[in-house]
Regions:
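A SIS-like phosphosugar-recognition module
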Residues: 400, 468-469
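Extracytoplasmic/secreted cell-surface and envelope-processing proteins
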Residues: 371, 471-472
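Alpha/beta enzyme core
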Residues: 7, 11-455, 461, 525-543
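Short alpha-helix boundary/capping motifs
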Residues: 1, 242, 381, 478-482
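Long, continuous compositionally biased terminal/linker segments
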Residues: 473-493
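Terpene synthase/cyclase
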Residues: 2-6
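Short acidic/histidine-rich active-site segments
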Residues: 462-467
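C-terminal functional modules
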Residues: 492-543
Length: 543
């Protein structure tokens, strides 16, 4: 059983299908009263449920992700990817599709987005990305994701077992051998998840408690951001407030302690800095001597020099190079950073995080621009040479417009004629077939590979793609079905497309586990089993 693609041996899998049968048979021979239990049925059920706990999943996927990180260090073409999934079914279908199209799941991950949990999974209803949703909904979704991925393993193996029984019944030894080899080389649908813990939902202890629950549910990688927990905003909205480094480092250590306590020693901590777009801090950092990390954080504060004579009642005053400085304080009691310091603060954040236990970085940017990211990563790598990023290929960016602007500006700078383009209107469909638009699309197509090579991006993710695909596909179906096309709007654009594209869900009873259940009934009741998959089951219409 290939539960260790790329040579990972942390999670022990059986040597062979026959070996698992032999182990079950040896056990059954010690239990003379277990009548009607067969070794092969036991072996099959064990193979269909190799990951028995979330910690099994976390340990296996952490080792997998560590191997991928090492591979990327040696070859930046080996970057990894994920799509954000807001339900276990979406994750399951993604991995089934990846296996169908590419034959393997290597370097394919899941991303769990706090934004989508807030918008789609909170009992309060749709919420903005401000950490107002129940924090227990995060580990609950992780558990759900892996429940569906494990069921994908069970379903695919069950189909192979049925084919094996058929080959034996027909006496087809060649086919039987092929199917047993397929079982022995089976690659699981279980892949790493990078899970969003926001800003920790409270203090360091609260972060630790939630991290434990997330790891126990199966998370091998926790992504934590340097915003103030109770002022948290989406990374692509205004009003972000960061915390001093000592506050953030305590939360990094809380995540690491949670991993180590639970025996997930390869666990990954992803530290996200929002400093590029955050102009405010809630606290002035504690500094013990000039040049320490607190002093460096405070050096970015927007201050004015004062004297004892013009100090006001209630002023907060800091000593900067022997001068009395008053940080600019807003009516909200927040302090303001100097404009134009975002990149410098990001670089300091990243270096400090990597020197204090972080494994991967996340720099939240306002646009998808390779050189902007690379410029910061170059500075970070002067201090930490193997620094690497997870990067948010965010739907909050207008990708079409951003890349058309980039091409337009490059053409203009190179002295090329741009007179037929209106930069302010480049989103218009009339530009779609122009050389500028085609060049922009090519840059979008190669963005991930190019930035993996140039900007140190190990993992490319889209945070909320399946939020948008759900809306788009539903809009298309509603337009056709409730319009003149009626039932043809569903049949032509959904069911017929599923059949022609080989989408497994066209047999929705099978996908939901009906065949697995039927086979279990046969294991338990033998010939007396009342099964759903008989001649009158309408799923037979789909072959």
């Amino acid at each position: 059983m290939n539960y260790q693609p790329r040579g990972i041996s942390t999670f022990q899998a059986p040597a062979s299908y026959q070996g698992e049968i032999d182990a079950a048979q040896a056990l059954l021979e010690t239990q003379p009263t277990w009548n009607g239990v067969t070794a092969e049925h036991v072996a099959r059920m064990r193979l269909q449920n190799r990951f028995r706990t979330g910690l099994d999943v976390a340990r296996y996927t952490a080792a997998l992700m560590r191997a991928d990180m090492a591979a990327y260090d040696g070859d930046p073409t080996k970057y990894t990817q994920s799509l954000g999934c807001w339900h276990g079914f979406i994750a399951q279908q993604k991995l089934i599709s990846v296996k169908k199209h590419f034959g393997k799941t290597d370097r394919t991950y899941l991303y769990l987005s706090g934004w989508m949990i807030a918008a789609l999974r909170s009992e309060f209803g749709p919420l903005p990305d401000q950490s107002m949703h129940e924090k227990t909904s995060v580990p609950a979704l992780i558990e759900e994701l892996y429940t569906f991925l494990r069921q994908a393993d069970s379903r695919e193996l069950n189909d192979i077992f049925r084919s094996l029984d058929k080959a034996r019944k027909e006496g087809d030894k060649t086919r039987e051998k092929e199917l047993i080899e397929k079982i022995d080389s089976f690659q699981t649908h279980v892949v790493p998840v990078i899970a969003d813990i926001d800003a920790g939902f409270g203090n360091a202890e609260a972060t630790y408690l939630l991290a434990k629950k997330m790891i126990e549910a199966g998370a091998c990688a926790l992504q934590i951001e340097n915003q103030v927990s109770d002022e948290k905003q989406c990374g692509h909205q205004d009003g972000k407030v960061t915390v001093p480094h000592d506050v953030f480092l305590a939360k990094i250590r809380a995540c690491r302690h949670a991993f180590l306590e639970l025996g997930v020693e390869d666990g990954i901590v992803v530290t996200r800095t929002d400093s590029l777009g955050a102009g405010l801090t809630q606290q002035i950092a504690v500094s013990h001597k000039p040049g320490d990390i607190g002093d460096q954080y405070n050096s970015f504060l927007d201050c004015e020099e004062i004297t004892a004579e013009n100090a006001r009642n209630g002023d907060v005053i800091i000593n900067r190079n022997g001068k009395m400085m008053r940080p600019k304080r807003l009516p909200s009691n927040l302090y303001q950073f100097r404009p134009g310091t975002g990149e410098d603060r990001c670089v300091l954040d990243c270096i400090t995080s990597l020197q204090n236990g972080a494994d991967l970085l996340w720099i939240e940017t306002e646009k998808p621009h390779i050189e902007q990211i690379a410029k910061m990563v170059d500075r970070i790598r002067k201090v930490v040479p193997n620094a690497k990023l997870a990067y948010n290929n965010s739907p909050s960016f207008n990708w079409t417009l951003n890349f058309r602007w980039q091409v337009y500006d490059a053409m203009k700078e190179a002295g090329k004629d741009v007179s037929k383009y209106n930069r302010a209107e480049l989103m218009k469909a009339e530009y779609d077939d122009t050389p500028l638009a085609k060049e922009a699309d090519e840059r979008i197509r190669t963005f991930q590979a190019d930035s993996a090579k140039r900007a140190g991006i190990f993992h490319h993710l889209i945070t909320l793609p399946t939020y948008h695909t759900a809306a788009l596909s539903t809009d298309n179906l509603a337009r056709e079905y409730f319009g003149e096309q009626g039932m043809l709007g569903y049949v032509k654009n959904v069911q017929r497309a599923e059949i022609r594209q080989g989408i497994a869900c066209v047999k929705h009873q099978n996908m939901a586990g009906s065949d697995i259940g039927d086979d279990h009934k046969e294991y338990f009741a033998g010939e007396a089993a009342l099964k759903a998959g008989g001649a009158d089951n309408t799923m037979n219409q789909f072959g």
